[in-house]
């Protein structure tokens, strides 16, 4: 099984173009399964799988251990050792993907995890920002440095087009159509889509890309957003700067760049955009994913109703 684990990780990297974050999660989740199956077969523990070095001489691990019963026992152990439901569901998803790969490559006759269901998650409604909070956040970057222009531009694009943080960092200069105010986005699973930008976002993007201090450090000539060394900006850097701006504006530290994606989706819905259009703009595979914003919008309307209705104010 070990060589199959590595073949699967190689497939994700080279054929599916999975992000480093995704690869790390798969590597960690399959390592966890490997550890469990080693215990089941009374093998001594071996090092976890590695994305960088697959030269370790692992003892044989038979596919005969890769059964529905053992997968169920593994998931039960994960729950009993206080792993979150979200983690358990992710690990089951990794196992199912690996099993599908094995079936496709005729390593096993059928997928033993296909009919296994993970623990049900409570529906957590995203809490969007108000428009005033969005404006306060956008005003946080200081514009005396090129990094301030960059960060203001990032925030404008998040709110303008509802982009994921990974889509922002992957954005290239060639993906921008300034004349039509459109962006060519490569989303999850290599899915591509075209999304519009607001005039305000276009102006900030032009100001940032034409900033003389940007050109003086530029080393990556394709990337749209650069760090202070002139290389492509990372998601970790965006997260770190985002937290600094939250602190500066006094907003909750639980807010993330993805919150702005939830926010613009909710604002679109409240202003009359239909769900199908929102689905296409956000790059959701399923309309069911987009439907959550109808619940958010109704929750906000109920809150405003409760806070402003005359009968409630009289209490």
From Swiss-Prot:
Domain of life assignment: Bacteria
Record SUPFAM superfamilies: DNA breaking-rejoining enzymes
Record localization: Cytoplasm
Active site residues of this protein: 164, 188, 258, 261, 284, 293 (o-(3'-phospho-dna)-tyrosine intermediate)
GO molecular function annotation: DNA binding; site-specific recombinase activity; tyrosine-based site-specific recombinase activity
Signal peptide: none
Record text on subunit structure and interactions: Forms a cyclic heterotetrameric complex composed of two molecules of XerC and two molecules of XerD.
Protein name stated in the entry: Tyrosine recombinase XerC
Taxonomic source organism: Chlamydia trachomatis serovar D (strain ATCC VR-885 / DSM 19411 / UW-3/Cx)
Gene name per UniProt: xerC
């Amino acid at each position: 099984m070990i060589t199959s684990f590595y073949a699967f990780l190689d497939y994700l990297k080279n054929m599916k173009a999975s992000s480093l974050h995704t690869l790390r999660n798969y590597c960690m989740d399959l390592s966890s399964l490997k550890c469990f199956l080693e215990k089941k077969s009374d093998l001594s523990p071996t090092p976890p799988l590695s994305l960088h070095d697959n030269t370790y001489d692992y003892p044989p691990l038979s596919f005969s251990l890769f059964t529905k019963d053992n997968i169920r026992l593994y998931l039960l152990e994960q729950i009993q050792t206080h792993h979150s439901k979200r983690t358990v569901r992710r690990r089951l998803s990794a196992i199912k993907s690996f099993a599908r790969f094995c079936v496709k490559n005729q390593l096993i006759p059928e997928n033993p995890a296909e009919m296994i269901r993970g623990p049900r998650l409570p529906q957590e409604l995203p809490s969007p920002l108000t428009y005033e909070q969005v404006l306060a956040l956008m005003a946080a970057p200081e514009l005396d440095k090129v990094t301030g222009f960059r960060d203001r531009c990032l925030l404008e694009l998040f709110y303008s087009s509802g982009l994921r943080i990974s889509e922002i960092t992957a954005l290239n200069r060639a993906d921008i159509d300034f004349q039509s105010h459109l962006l060519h986005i490569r989303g999850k699973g290599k899915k591509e889509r075209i999304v519009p930008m607001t005039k305000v976002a276009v102006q900030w993007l032009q100001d940032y890309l034409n900033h003389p201090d940007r050109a003086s450090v530029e080393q990556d000539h394709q990337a749209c957003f650069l760090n202070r060394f002139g290389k492509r900006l990372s998601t970790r850097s965006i997260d770190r700067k985002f937290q600094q701006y939250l602190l500066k504006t006094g907003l909750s530290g639980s807010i993330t760049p993805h919150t702005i994606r939830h926010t613009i989706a909710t604002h679109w819905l409240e202003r009359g955009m239909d769900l199908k259009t929102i689905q296409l703009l956000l790059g959701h595979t399923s309309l069911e994913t987009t439907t959550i914003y109808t619940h958010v919008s109704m929750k906000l309307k109920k809150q405003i109703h409760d806070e402003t209705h005359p009968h409630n104010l009289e209490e």
